[in-house]
Amino acid sequence: MSDPTRTPIGATLSVDPEWGRTARAWGIFAGIAFAIATAAFVVEATGLLASSPAYTPTAAGQLIDEAKFFAASFGYQQQVLWDYVLRDGLYFFAYLALIPLAIGLREVAGHRRVAPQLAAAFLVVAANFGCMNAFMTFVQVDYWKNSGWDQVPAAIMVAVGRDVDLMNGLTRWAGIASFAALAIALYYLGRACRSGGVLPGWLGVVAYVGAAILLAMIVVSQVSGTDAINNLLSLAIGMVVAPIVTIGLGVHIARAASGAPEPVDGR
């Protein structure tokens, strides 16, 4: 049986054994964080915490109607503020955790191999957009945490509401960008697993399933009236696929690092 720590030309790879503890810790953390954050997202999205307001045109006119809608929306966001802080705080650090996993993957499996290196690269891209998505949510929290919006003049309320709507759109598209990058990363991770070496074949199957789910989520997000489908896909990717991939990746990077030769002379 071939040694998975050797390159195609037979040179032994030097891997810092510290990657064993590091990759395992970040993988487990990411898996748990993604699962809890996803649960918090679905609980809020399905209206279990409170009912989100809907825009209703009246004889008062568009300005007044929009002002009342934005004031009610801010009141709702304040009511479920703890959920946003919990889930987006966890999402932020869960996406950050993908970076050490990506570097660890490249260390133990990426030398001279296209698939692991591209998987690592797109994991980092996904991490950046995912962190941006969570960060911009906290910008909106600065508005939602304040009360008394129903006392604000209509013109000012509409201006503030539209500004927050713009930020919400940027947040949503940052999330879609992270899904796209993560889908590509999972595709290449699946290819890396199929080619043998330090990564098991079953992890590749899960990675392919995750890539398909993420692509489906991107499509569904552009179709109105598909919230229930999106929630189901979110549960599948966040509470099943993400924990399996991140924890599995961390564990197998750790195993590969513990079985590889230590670096010599700082290399």
Positions of predicted regions on the chain:
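Hydrophobic, aromatic-enriched alpha-helical segments typical of multi-pass transmembrane helices
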Residues: 2-267
